Curated annotation (Swiss-Prot):
Catalyzes the condensation of acetyl-CoA with acetoacetyl-CoA to form 3-hydroxy-3-methylglutaryl-CoA (HMG-CoA). Functions in the mevalonate (MVA) pathway leading to isopentenyl diphosphate (IPP), a key precursor for the biosynthesis of isoprenoid compounds that are building blocks of archaeal membrane lipids. It catalyses: acetoacetyl-CoA + acetyl-CoA + H2O = (3S)-3-hydroxy-3-methylglutaryl-CoA + CoA + H(+). This is Hydroxymethylglutaryl-CoA synthase. Disulfide bonds: none annotated. Belongs to the thiolase-like superfamily. Archaeal HMG-CoA synthase family. SUPFAM superfamilies: Thiolase-like. CoA binds at K240. It comes from Metallosphaera sedula (strain ATCC 51363 / DSM 5348 / JCM 9185 / NBRC 15509 / TH2). It holds the Pfam family ACP_syn_III. Coiled coil: none annotated.
Length: 348
């Protein structure tokens, strides 16, 4: 392909709650927290949502891209936690960021994989010459039923990428593939405030099977081997699954660590694997190769092979790193977290 990532940006709210505090409120055993491999999760402020976070991440991505925002002719937004059930967030991005009003826009849905599906679409549209640049954003204030195990991991963050031609790219996409089946591991019906999950399906039938198939197909199609890659980034529903996935594929664990964000902030759904990818781009060197494999319940996985170019060196310095947002933090208690994430029902 002749396309790639030109600019990237991250955003993580500064508030955190200890996973052990959530577990304590609901009387969960210490072993439950330990099994997830998590310590803290990010919490949105009272005035933050998936739209505001998307704007923050996109500003950094556009800064790194070093282009006029009006040249962006496509905006795709992937999220499980849209502010409006019926109103386009991607249209809000057009005006908020000063993108071209003659743009193709869409809000995408496929659980945690929606933004990744958007990336494949963006690469194709730029490759075909139908648009010059595309903005793809994944942003979630992840939802979870109070007391459910999901509440221990569901977090908030956003990540954005500007896609353009290979000659301008910081990371050129070599190849991509997808693997999708009808697997009922996680769902939320219309009108339900929180998702449900079929625990028997969440591990092997969903996460592991789909990522394995997508990555294996990518390696077969390209003729590349695990040893050809410097970094691997997998979807991160918790702090353990990505390392188990690495072992299943024969990937050295050292190649996974830089792309891990869930161990630091929890699982921000659409900003999970892609935020890990942004964290890799913050430190990657020219010539290095990165494999990225997002996953979305329902279920599907994409796999990408990226090669880093020398253009990344200048752009790494132009905006805040992912770690900047991860490291600036303020702890809150469960009551504050429950209030800002609207866990309480208020009746007038």
């Amino acid at each position: 392909m002749h396309t790639g990532i030109i600019g990237w940006g991250s955003y993580v709210p500064k508030y955190r709650i200890k996973v052990s505090d959530i577990a304590s409120v609901w009387g969960k055993e210490e072993g439950v927290v330990k099994a997830l491999g998590l310590t803290e999760k990010s919490v949105p402020a009272a005035d933050e949502d998936s739209t505001t976070m998307a704007i923050e991440a996109s500003r950094d991505a556009l800064t790194r891209a070093m282009i006029d925002p009006r040249e962006v002719e496509m905006a795709l937004f992937g999220s499980e936690s849209k502010v409006y059930a019926v109103k386009s967030t991607s249209a809000i991005l057009i005006d908020a960021l000063g993108l071209s009003k003659f743009s193709l826009t869409a809000d995408l849905e496929f659980a945690c994989r929606a933004a990744s599906a958007g990336l494949r679409m963006a690469f194709s549209m730029v490759e075909s010459g139908q648009v010059s640049y595309s903005l793809v954003v994944g942003s979630d204030t992840a939802q979870s039923n109070p007391g459910d195990v999901l509440e221990l991991s569901s977090a908030a963050a956003a990540v954005a990428f500007v896609v353009g031609r290979a000659e301008e790219a910081s990371a050129v996409v070599e190849a991509s593939t997808s693997y999708v089946t009808d697997t009922p591991d996680f769902w939320r019906r219309d009108g339900m405030p929180y998702p449900l999950h079929g625990e028997a399906f969440t591990g092997e039938p969903a996460y592991f099977a789909h990522i394995y198939e997508a990555v294996n197909r990518l390696l077969q199609d390209t003729g590349l081997k695990v040893s050809d890659f410097d970094y691997f980034v997998f979807h991160q529903p918790n702090g353990k699954f990505p390392f188990q996935m690495a072992k299943k594929l024969g990937v050295p664990l050292e190649k996974v660590k830089q792309g891990m964000v869930s161990t630091l902030i929890g699982n921000p759904y659409n900003a999970s694997a892609l935020l890990g990818f942004a964290r890799v781009l913050d430190v990657a060197k020219p010539g290095q190769r990165v494999l990225v494999a997002p996953f979305g319940s329902g279920a599907g996985s994409d796999a990408y092979s990226f090669v880093i170019t020398d253009k990344i060196l200048e752009r790494q310095k132009l905006a805040h790193t992912t770690d900047y947002y991860i490291q600036r933090k303020k702890l809150v208690d469960y009551a504050s977290y429950a209030k800002t994430t609207h866990k309480f029902k208020v009746y007038d």
